[in-house]
Amino acid sequence: QLFECSDGIRVIGDEMHDVENAVNAIEYLLKMTERGETLNEQTVRYVIGMVGAGSAGLLHSLDGDCVCITSRGKPIKAKTVGQKNYLDSIASNTVTIAVGPAGTGKTFLAVAMAVNALRAKQVNRIILTRPAVEAGERLGFLPGDLQSKIDPYLRPLYDALFEMLGMEGYTRNVEKGAIEIAPLAYMRGRTLDDSFIILDEAQNTTPE
């Protein structure tokens, strides 16, 4: 049980272990707010779950530097231990393969790492690509010209770049060739030196 007091929060429980877990979870959540992070139900549940599983120490690995600053000044950081491991893998390996449910930040964090590498001049350009269709679909059955057909499939990549760079920054980098977004089918025979390459939705690729 939690009780609000004049000097803080009092935690009362039958088991000392449970009380300690509750205190650890509350202290970490307070630390997150002090860093300016926004709390939501998903974040609170994650912290409680990690503490309850005896992994409270791993939460402190998330306190590191941000990956990237968005065009609106928002810092992008790992919010879970899985995301932290993902970012560490990208930073230390030539190729990283990420598998996970939709909405877990795979594309967004990869784009953040790419933008950070471009800003730091570690790479000369960012190439983002994905299969132009979902598994079992054909472009020929979709209305419009080729660009209008493939744009909906590339929208998650556009959204992530707009968040990181803003519309003006995105347009400027595209015009000078520093950012390229294209269907995977257009990548055959390309020279990809000094590039940060992200292949999104790779599970929809075919042997061809």
Identify the function of each model-found stretch.
Residues 95:
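Walker A (P-loop) ATP-phosphate-binding motif of ABC ATPase nucleotide-binding domains
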Residues 108-178:
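Conserved P-loop
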Residues 194, 201:
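Walker B catalytic acidic pair
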Residues 206-207:
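Conserved D-loop-proximal element of ABC-family nucleotide-binding domains
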Residues 75-91:
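Pre-Walker A adenine-sensing motif
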Residues 98-100:
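Hydrophobic anchor at the beta1->P-loop junction of P-loop NTPases
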Residues 3-63:
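Interdomain "pre-motor" coupling segment immediately N-terminal to P-loop NTPase/helicase cores
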Residues 105:
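Conserved glycine(s) of the Walker
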